[in-house]
Amino acid sequence: MSDRLVRFPGMSWQEIEALPQPLRWTVQRTIFHLLGEPVPTLADPFPSDDPLPGAYELHLPSDGVTIWYTVTPHEGQEVISIQHVRLDT
């Protein structure tokens, strides 16, 4: 794939904007890095018991936040769709 796009369907962008500022920056920076490496070694297939093709869970333990996203090919591009962002409790 020569090009990648990031989508924020549903409420995912609002979930990011609702985070405290330092975590918001961390999540935004992490999403930016997904453009260079859509499936980093820290990303786990999701759900763990029966993974869906292209679905990942990226847990950032030092920041206490998890990002769920999908990576799918579309017309010669990879589309990274941020599905859900949540603070770990």
Q: Where in the sequence are the language-model features?
A:
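Enriched for short, Lys/Arg-rich terminal
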Residues: 2-5, 14, 18, 24-25, ...
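A short, surface-exposed loop/turn module that caps and links secondary-structure elements
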Residues: 32-60
